Design a protein with these regions (language model features):
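N-terminal, well-ordered alpha-helical segments
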Residues: 47-54, 75, 86, 110, ...
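Thioredoxin-like thiol-disulfide oxidoreductase module
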Residues: 61-94, 170-191
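Generic structural signal for well-ordered secondary structure
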Residues: 46-49, 70, 81-82, 105
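Local sequence-structure signature of Cys/Sec-based thiol-disulfide redox active-site neighborhoods
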Residues: 14-59, 134-169, 173
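Short, surface-exposed acidic/glycine-rich loop or hinge patches that mediate macromolecular interfaces
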Residues: 71, 103, 148-151, 178-179
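Non-catalytic, surface beta->alpha helical segment in thiol-disulfide oxidoreductase systems
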Residues: 87-123
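Catalytic cores of large soluble enzymes that bind and process phosphate-bearing ligands
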Residues: 4, 41, 45, 104
Length: 191
């Protein structure tokens, strides 16, 4: 399945050539695709997440992808603190990591790309007073943002959470697509 049109690819290639300075690594936690599904190990969004990242990686030599089988990569799961799939960890040298649970699509896709680009450029989108405020954080904080692909408000909040995480190593941002995790939607009463 092709996710991007030729025009989309052309625009993204241009954008990545211009905006990516440092290399980006995506670590995808997924399951092995198989015709046999083991109960409790289903992940209907995993193939789409992998396909999306593979298409993005094909657009720039500065973007790489490492794929982990969630059920086999216990040490890596602990290292990245991953507890559900699909999980996309975005990293770049010298920057804090960003985590997206699910498939970044709809309004979340541009936020996903902007986070990656800001990370690669070491550029903050925050005002200096806000940056100073985040520099005063003195303990670990996890910002868990629940989003859906059709919510522009959630996209704005996710963008701010990513900016905060890129500002301080003590702040981590987890963006969670509630459409892919209905049990979390119910548990946290997300509408």
């Amino acid at each position: 399945m092709v996710l991007f049109t030729d025009q989309n690819r052309k625009e993204l290639k241009r954008r990545f050539r211009k905006d990516l300075k440092k290399e980006i690594l995506f670590s995808l936690f997924t399951t092995n695709s198989s015709l046999l599904t083991i109960p409790g190990r289903e992940c209907p969004d995993c193939p789409q997440a992998q396909e999306l990242l593979e298409e993005i990686c094909a657009l720039s030599p500065k973007i790489d992808l490492k794929i982990y089988n969630y059920f086999d990569a216990l040490e890596s799961r602990r290292q990245y603190d991953i507890d559900k799939i699909p999980a996309i960890v975005t990293e770049s040298e010298g920057a804090n990591r960003l985590v997206f649970y699910g498939v970044p699509q709809g309004y979340q896709f541009p936020v996903f790309l902007e986070g990656m680009e800001r990370m690669s450029r070491d550029v903050s989108s925050l005002a200096n007073t806000t940056r100073k405020g985040f520099s005063k954080v003195d303990r670990l904080v996890t910002l868990r943002i629940f989003v859906s692909s059709n919510s522009i408000t959630a996209a704005s909040v996710a963008k701010l959470a990513q900016a905060a995480a890129l500002e301080s190593r003590l702040i981590s941002a987890e963006i969670i697509d509630v459409n892919g995790f209905p049990e979390l939607r119910r548990a946290y009463n997300v509408s």
